[in-house]
Amino acid sequence: MGDLARLPLLEKAPTTHARLLAWVEEVAELTQPDRIHWVDGSEAENKKLTDELVEAGTLKRLNPETFPNSFAAFSDPADVARVEEQTFICSENERDAGFTNNWMAPAEMKQKLRGLFAGSMRGRTMYVIPFVMGHLDAEDPKFGVEITDSAYVVASMRIMARIGTDVLDRITQTDAFFVPALHSLGAPLEAGQADVAWPCNTDKWIVHFPEERSIWSFGSGYGGNALLGKKCYALRIASVMARDEGWLAEHMLILKLTSPEQKTYYISAAFPSACGKTNLALLDPTIKGWKVETLGDDITWMRFGKEGELRAVNPEAGLFGVAPGTGWGTNPNAMRAIAKGNSIFTNVALTDDGGVWWEGMTEETPAHLTDWRGESWTPDSDAPAAHPNSRFCTPIDQIDMLAEEYFSPEGVELSAILFGGRRKTTIPLVTEARNWSNGIFMGSTLSSETTAAAAGAVGVVRRDPMAMLPFIGYDAGDYLNHWVNLSAKANPERLPKIFLVNWFRRTAEGGFAWPGFGDNARVLKWAIERLEGKADAVETPIGFVPTGESIDLEGLDMTPAEVESAVRVDPAEWATELASIEEWFANFGESLPAALQSELDGLKTRLG
């Protein structure tokens, strides 16, 4: 075992899984950690790790009366978001990565990564985290093992995924396939060298090898770059698995809607980051008799059931939400879940009484805070107190409105799929697709103004197909074709209806054309009534939109004429939009599905 005599925990590994042991040994030899710890996921282990993180200054323990068993972390200012320019899909063939992904030949990338990872865990503990995405007792559980040198990652993964001994035992007993997910902060400690509160490296690489189903992440301790079960596995690698196995891994919420007649419907919805996905998943309806429960706020895996129905499951165990804008006024259900504790906050502000705060959390701004950079802050300060991409990480089972179906490995049958972006003009409040193919066209041309969740310019309109642009693990044209072709597996009577929504449309005066938040239930109600054949609509060149009277406005200070204005299809705006869509589709070249070209041609004809 070479130099591994100094790694005593390897001999006492709690598994006999040959591939796993060989991989752990290979990584230990490469990264040279001081010790190896197999994560069991227990309370005692979590307490020990969080105590150590508090002592190291990585975590700050919050006031136990207001935020029980909760902590705040503050990252290096250069490590605050996903790094899309350093995220790679290293497929064997460059064409399979497509134009939306960065690519490097796998052998060349592996050589580069081995150089970076060599000795990268020196002076640190190497944690081995067995995890499962979805349910352990699912028909086809999807396993992973993350190796990391960050205890913050262990504590966060414990919230976000099902981890620990039960998972490892199942991997061992069934000799299961697992996705190896390797993560290092890239901050080795030499003997006697003092650590910093947030170790990271200026050189960051987030790399996926789709054919071998593996992930290597170097240099970042932040969220999606480091919690590898999340975007890296559950979307980028899982989308490739889904392509090969005939299912879908999508950037979507799942909600359960119950009508006053006690009829239930399940809806999934795809929105780019910071477009209200968590708020919709945790919706408090403002219309009488309608009830919303949630099954998930970020990632949905969908498969066809035995009768050709499309079924959805949330593979995650926690919420990893953008904090700013989440407040008692806008999302009380999220706030109640957070108030139960057991949460980790990253890059929020601290109140003087040991609590946390961020923009939009309360109506009144505290008179004094410590901002996310550790500086004294008052409402007169120039910069926001919390980073725009600051996060809360909270167990999903703390949500009072969690639907019991969340715990079902079979998932739920979808009645509708929503696609939504953030556009000030052009896109109506809600549009019903003409059919499945037209709905995929809507999803493929989804667009939004960029947000703080990704590093780079803010406020530029970018196309974001199915809200998956940063997360498609293979060629984007092949991905859209996979969506188109899936309908062949479906029972056409049971295919979900597709709708395009835009909560962010502005009026001519510059205000929002729609109140949003809890009132979005009124749009969901219209969509459900369309499924049931009960609501009126107007046919437009882009699809069906509500009549002014068909949206329930009871109790809302809004007129049918204002609804008509919010769903108006403006020919001049759509002439510009058509040109923009043509430019977008040109990127796909040969891989653009013929069905989508024909949808575009049809739209052109209808717009005249």
UniProtKB/Swiss-Prot annotation:
Active site: C275
Catalytic activity, reaction form: oxaloacetate + GTP = phosphoenolpyruvate + GDP + CO2
Cofactor binding note: Binds 1 Mn(2+) ion per subunit.
Binding site for substrate: R82, Y222, G223, G224, S273, N389, S390, R391
Subcellular location: Cytoplasm
A biological process from GO: propionate catabolic process
EC number(s) recorded for this UniProt protein: 4.1.1.32
Chief subcellular location: cytoplasm
UniProt keyword terms in alphabetical order: Cytoplasm, Decarboxylase, Gluconeogenesis, GTP-binding, Lyase, Manganese, Metal-binding, Nucleotide-binding
Pathway where it operates: Carbohydrate biosynthesis; gluconeogenesis
EC class: lyase
Binding of Mn(2+), residues: K231, H251, D298
Disulphides: none
Molecular function GO terms recorded: GTP binding; manganese ion binding; phosphoenolpyruvate carboxykinase (GTP) activity
Chain positions recorded as GTP binding sites: A274, C275, G276, K277, T278, N279, R391, R422, F517, G518, D519, N520
Any single GO CC term annotated in Swiss-Prot or TrEMBL for this entry: cytosol
Cofactor: Mn(2+)
Family label: Belongs to the phosphoenolpyruvate carboxykinase [GTP] family.
Job description of the protein: Catalyzes the conversion of oxaloacetate (OAA) to phosphoenolpyruvate (PEP), the rate-limiting step in the metabolic pathway that produces glucose from lactate and other precursors derived from the citric acid cycle.
Assembly description: Monomer.
Listed name of the protein: Phosphoenolpyruvate carboxykinase [GTP]
UniProt source species: Paenarthrobacter aurescens (strain TC1)
Lineage summary: Bacteria, Bacillati, Actinomycetota, Actinomycetes, Micrococcales
Gene: pckG
